[in-house]
Amino acid sequence: MPSAAAWWDWAVRLCLAAAAAAYGFTWVCVLAGTPSNKRLRQLLFVCLRVLFSLVRCIGKLLYAESAISRAYIQVLNHLILRRPLCLPPRQVLLLAPHCLQWDQCPHKITRNVQNCRRCGRCPIGEMTALSERLGISFAVVPGGTLARQVVAACRPKAVVAVACERDLISGMQDVAPLPAVGLLNKRPNGPCFNTDVDIRALTEILSAMIGEDA
């Protein structure tokens, strides 16, 4: 007869499997057609958030946590971008991590991004020019605490953030129910050091938020 520990192990496995199935079903519902009802969309966000925590446990066991996190970000983005927001540009806030800045740069940009000299050694200059061209607010932040302060100070109607999987997910959850779209940074030199971003993809996201062609 199986021991109590064995029964407990199987119960945990079944719960995780059920959570994974429910998460997958919710994702299918989202991709099939995002509901127009605001409360129903918010309910989907809540369901995804709760189920993601459980499914991430499965990801850790299968060494697939990063892939699951990327899929979660993709679903959240889909919920936001499926229907154009057409927001006034100044009501959209672009947040970028400090690790995008060239590590040898002497200019402090976390308090004022206009200190960027646009030398081309990192993507901050391009992002600054893009935000100015579109009329979007732009800030570079060293961490989640300052990011929340910037959001509270700017009071945007929507946020576009560039970061790694962990920071994107925590940030997108922190600002909920504010619409937030996440774009993963590139890490050719490893995490948190001279990272990069796909400017073309960022342009498309920002343009979609304000209802303009990229």
Locate the predicted segments by residue.
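Proline-aspartate-enriched helix->loop->beta-strand connector
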Residues: 155-157
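A short, gly/pro- and small-residue-rich
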Residues: 113-117, 171-188
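N-terminal, charge-rich interaction modules
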Residues: 2-124
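Short, well-ordered alpha-helical microsegments
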Residues: 124, 147-149, 167-172
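Short amphipathic alpha-helical segments
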Residues: 107-108, 152, 171-174
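Mid-length scaffold segments of soluble, non-membrane domains
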Residues: 116, 120-140
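Short His-Asn-centered micro-motif
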Residues: 96-97, 139-144, 160-164
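Ser/Thr/Gly-rich flexible loops in soluble cytosolic domains mediating phosphotransfer, phosphorylation
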Residues: 181-214
